[in-house]
Swiss-Prot record:
Endonuclease IV plays a role in DNA repair. It cleaves phosphodiester bonds at apurinic or apyrimidinic (AP) sites, generating a 3'-hydroxyl group and a 5'-terminal sugar phosphate. Zn(2+) 2 binds at E153, D187, H224, E269. InterPro entries: AP_endonuc_2 (IPR001719), AP_endonuc_F2_Zn_BS (IPR018246), Xyl_isomerase-like_sf (IPR036237), Xyl_isomerase-like_TIM-brl (IPR013022). Zn(2+) 3 binds at H190, D237, H239. Signal peptide: none annotated. GO terms for biological process: base-excision repair. Its cofactor is Zn(2+). This is Probable endonuclease 4. Belongs to the AP endonuclease 2 family. The keyword Metal-binding applies. CDD domains: AP2Ec. It is an enzyme of class 3 (hydrolase). It comes from Chlamydia caviae (strain ATCC VR-813 / DSM 19441 / 03DC25 / GPIC) (Chlamydophila caviae). Zn(2+) 1 binds at H75, H115, E153.
Amino acid sequence: MQVFPPPQVPLLGAHTSTAGGLHNAIYEGQEIGASTIQMFTANQRQWRRRPLTDSLINSFKTALKETSLSYIMSHAGYLINPGSPNPEILEKSRICIQQEIQDCISLGINFVNFHPGAAVNDTKETCLDRIISSFSLMEPLFENSPPLVVLFETTAGQGTLVGSNFEELSYLIDNLNHKIPVGVCIDTCHIFAAGYDITSPESWKRVLKNFDDVIGLSYLRAFHLNDSMFPLGQHKDRHAPLGEGDIGIESFKFLMTNEDTRMIPKYLETPGGPDLWAKEIRQLQSFQK
């Protein structure tokens, strides 16, 4: 189930700050030369969300019109675990997922990105089935076909997290794509940490073919661009500035120029803040000239 087409121009951005209001994330994106952004719609480390007001919504939509940024992504909170074996955590997670989706629809956001979940003391198979049940409950929210896609982010495979391999993500998508719009956000640091070699054009082509065979490239809707502080397959989620980690700059140059990936929206999560992101956006844009 797809609700809107891919962008017609390459989109680059970063995870910007909502300090002072959600609309400020949009304006910060404009300041760093971004054409899209990722943001939190609520405090990512709290269960309780502040309700959206008409004023907040209008300010956000005004910022979108003034800046022409598009394909905005919301990153869901870190406490959410839709595969939790703990009934209390599971119920809180499902409430947060519902609220997150509702807020994204109200704001006109196109992507909402979730970490799939963690098995904790259960099996990964049971965790995956529980995640499917959690997101199946969201089907009524999509009855009017809002232009919003739920994205599952690739994980580094640390601890009991699921989603570190394409097979697990495929299982989620195959069981949900007839109920809600779903896709995948590849985090470059995470898949590298999980054991996918993406250090060269040749290795990237193998990974993308694997993705296409297992999931289908039409479900690849976004990238988180991060280098890695640790070598391949260490299952450690530690981001580094582009070209300053073990992945290397050629990997990101490939994503900007390869026909299958150049038009997919890309969001920086590199450590360093707005000044670094502005520099990295200019560098990435230069690869396409």
